[in-house]
């Protein structure tokens, strides 16, 4: 498991940022996306910050963090508001009132909301395509999707960052951050799923009609593939990781057997994903298919197996935005970190949900890190 750190410069009026530096350092003290050893986690953050500062020549004080632990969950809720203006025109105040009521309807015992986004609107019982502001009616209703996290896990992350000397500007679900880079507006409109395969977790985000309609995290990841190879060949974890990534291959490790081991674990992953799609009635029904990112997305079997098991078009993410970036741009395993840059540039607001951070005035220099896979 690694901590990915990116330092970007985003010139005023530029459509894409310049990558100043991107570094990856070992992560300790984290299991399945949440902190299990606070001192080790603090050391991991501090080590990553120091290396990024050394390579970029920039002092890092503030950060946008991604989080993708197994304690994340998504829940739908509803809210409403009686239109406040005498002429019945829907105002931003009415919209905020309905959204607040929807969030307050969620049971938050031991949990905190880290992201929320409207799924649909109704005005006087009729569906409203797009934003309702400026329309006229009596009662506004909204359905939202909120992503929550165990309060203890979130507090541990904030504490670790503070002890490492870094101010947390915002915390964003990892697959939501990756979607900012990996998905197009057209894909979001017709229906698409982002699958982020991390070391110990797989997180998914489903979009339709331009909004987030589904989200889940599964306690399985590319580390499980490494463990399976180690058991299958009775070798060390280091050797197994090298075989998984293709950096070593010999006659003593038959390719067919390696592929069978990897395929079996990937099949488990896609079976879990399809189960969730069936739950939200989208199995085989996303025209823009599946876009796969993360450190576990690089194996040659991933695309074909996803296509067969999910019955959807599938590809490993490779958005044009990355090719337009200047500097040491990495592969799709870095999509979460780059996606945080898109969120952070929105002048203090997340473009598609609650949260966001950073300043977009002049040159945008921000420390972006993918700490929890």
What are these regions (language model features)?
Residues 76, 181-183, 205, 301-305, ...:
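Short, well-ordered secondary-structure micro-motifs
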Residues 214-216, 226, 238-240, 270, ...:
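Extended hydrophobic-aromatic, low-complexity segments
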Residues 89-91, 218-233, 302-303, 310-316:
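Gly/Ser/Thr-rich active-site loops/lids in small-molecule metabolic enzymes
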Residues 65-70, 197, 288-298:
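Glycine-rich beta-strand-to-loop/alpha-helix junction loops that act as flexible
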Residues 180-248:
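Acidic, glycine-rich loop-and-beta core segments that form the ion-binding/anion-interacting portion
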Residues 2-63, 67-193, 211-213, 222, ...:
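Nucleotide/phosphate-binding catalytic cleft detector across ATP-hydrolyzing
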Residues 211-214, 292, 296-343:
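Nucleotide-binding motor/catalytic cores of P-loop/tubulin-like NTPases across gene-expression machines
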Residues 216, 220, 231-234, 249-268, ...:
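A short glycine-/small-residue-rich loop at the edge of a beta-strand within enzyme catalytic domains
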């Amino acid at each position: 498991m690694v901590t990915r750190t990116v330092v970007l410069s985003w010139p005023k009026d530029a459509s894409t940022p310049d990558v100043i530096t991107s570094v990856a350092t070992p992560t300790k003290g984290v299991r399945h996306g949440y902190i299990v050893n606070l001192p080790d986690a603090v050391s991991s953050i501090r080590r990553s910050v120091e290396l990024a500062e050394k390579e970029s020549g920039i002092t890092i004080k503030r950060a946008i963090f991604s989080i993708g632990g197994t304690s994340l969950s998504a829940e739908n809720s509803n809210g409403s508001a009686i239109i406040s203006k005498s002429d019945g025109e829907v105002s931003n105040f009415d919209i905020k009132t309905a959204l607040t009521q929807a969030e307050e309807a969620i049971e938050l015992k031991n949990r905190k909301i880290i992201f929320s986004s409207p799924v649909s609107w109704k005005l006087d019982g009729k569906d409203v395509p797009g934003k309702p502001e400026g329309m006229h009616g009596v009662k506004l209703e909204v359905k939202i999707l909120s992503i929550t996290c165990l309060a203890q896990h979130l507090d541990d992350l904030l504490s670790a960052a503070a002890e490492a000397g870094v101010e947390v500007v915002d915390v964003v679900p990892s697959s939501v951050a990756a979607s900012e880079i990996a998905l197009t507006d057209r894909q979001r409109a017709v229906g698409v799923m982002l699958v982020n395969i991390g070391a110990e977790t797989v997180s998914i985000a489903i979009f339709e009609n331009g909004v987030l309609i589904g989200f889940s995290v599964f306690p399985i990841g590319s580390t499980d593939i490494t463990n399976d190879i180690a058991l299958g060949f009775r070798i060390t974890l280091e050797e197994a990781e090298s075989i998984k990534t293709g950096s070593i291959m010999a006659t003593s490790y038959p390719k067919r057997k390696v592929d069978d081991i990897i395929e079996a674990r990937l099949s488990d992953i896609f079976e879990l994903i399809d189960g969730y799609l069936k739950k939200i009635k989208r199995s085989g029904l996303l025209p823009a298919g599946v876009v796969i990112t993360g450190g576990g997305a690089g194996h040659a079997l991933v695309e074909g197996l996803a296509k067969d098991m999910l019955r959807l078009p599938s590809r490993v993410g490779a958005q044009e935005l990355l090719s337009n970036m200047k500097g040491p741009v990495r592969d799709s395993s870095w999509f979460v970190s780059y996606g945080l840059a898109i969120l952070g540039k929105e002048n203090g607001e997340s473009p598609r949900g609650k949260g966001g951070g950073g300043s977009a005035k002049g040159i945008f220099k921000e420390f972006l890190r993918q700490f929890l896979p």
